[in-house]
């Protein structure tokens, strides 16, 4: 079964990730990594550095996922982490 079919909603995906499910973590990364790389690239202007910033950002996403309260946009929450991580790079 593909990862796309394992989680019926974003809320279920986040809850599974909060419980430490590695499949949920992979799915979140696959779903958002291309958009988040674009955000990081706007700050880094170098593919290698942007990818490093994005990876550090996802480490924070998974480390802090318990602080996301399922209110508001999950993508927006991830985006804010990526922007903050990018600003720390500058």
Task: Name what the model sees in each region.
Residues 1-8, 12-15:
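Intrinsic, short, N-terminal disordered tails of RNA polymerase sigma-factor systems
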Residues 2-4, 18-27, 37-56:
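Short, charged helix-capping/linker segments at alpha-helix termini
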Residues 11-18, 58, 62:
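Regular secondary-structure segments
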Residues 28-32, 36, 82-85:
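Hydrophobic/aromatic residues within well-ordered alpha-helical segments
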Residues 38, 52-59, 72-84:
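Structural recognition of an alpha-helix C-terminal capping motif at a helix-to-coil junction
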Residues 66-71:
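Short alpha-helix-to-loop micro-motif enriched in aromatics/charged/Gly
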